[in-house]
UniProtKB/Swiss-Prot annotation:
Principal location: secreted
Coiled-coil segments on the chain, per record: none
Subcellular location(s) per record: Secreted
Signal peptide: 1-19
Keyword terms, alphabetized: Disulfide bond, Repeat, Secreted, Signal
Family: Belongs to the dermatopontin family.
Function: Possesses the property of inducing both aggregation of amebocytes and agglutination of erythrocytes.
Stated name of the protein: Hemagglutinin/amebocyte aggregation factor
GO biological process, one term: collagen fibril organization
GO cellular component: extracellular matrix; extracellular space
Disulfide bond annotation, renumbered to this chain: C32-C58, C67-C172, C84-C110, C111-C117, C123-C167
Length: 172
């Protein structure tokens, strides 16, 4: 009998379901540990709540960073288009949801190592990584860091689609 395998699968499922950073309609506040930046992004959408739950994974990419949160980078129902400054990587997100507007406003946590610059020749934007109301899964390619996000909102679907920018960092 394969009962240990069944227990592991059930445990894995329970662990994953509890891994969301935010609740439906709740605040989101996530920062990678010092010296890490965002490596993976996952999200699911609920038509009932007209909101997304989010999860992030991090990877060691920085040595001695200085970090800051931006001001809000989008208005309700408007385009979000943001890139960190040269040499910076995205290491966190902060947002809150408004039930009347069924949207989120976002702040982004950028971190920079001294003497690091963005190698703009290596930068690339993804296409949209999720469909309206669909799951979102994105992994930053090996040896790259997450540097930018684009998101558009649709008032009929009350959801956002997302694109991400990744770049390599180089010594300045």
């Amino acid at each position: 009998m394969n009962s240990p395998a069944i227990v592991i699968i059930i445990f894995s499922t329970l662990t994953f379901s509890e891994a969301w950073v935010n609740d439906w309609d709740g605040a989101l506040n996530f920062q990678c540990q010092l010296k890490d930046s965002i490596k993976t992004i996952s999200s699911i959408h609920s038509n009932h709540h007209e909101d997304r739950r989010w999860n992030f994974g991090c990877e060691r990419t920085l040595r001695d960073p200085s970090c800051y949160f931006t001001n809000y980078v989008n208005d309700w129902d408007k385009l979000l288009h943001f890139t960190c400054k040269s040499g910076e990587a995205i290491a966190g997100f902060n947002s809150y949801h408004d039930n009347r507007r069924e949207d989120r406003r976002w702040k982004i946590y950028c971190c920079k190592d001294k003497n690091k610059c963005t190698d703009y020749r290596t930068c690339a934007w993804t296409g949209y990584v999720n469909s309206w109301d669909g799951d979102l899964h994105y992994t930053v390619p090996k040896d790259y860091v997450l540097t930018g996000v684009i998101s558009e909102h649709d008032n009929h679907r009350e959801d956002r689609r997302w694109k991400f920018q990744h770049c390599r960092l180089k010594n300045c």
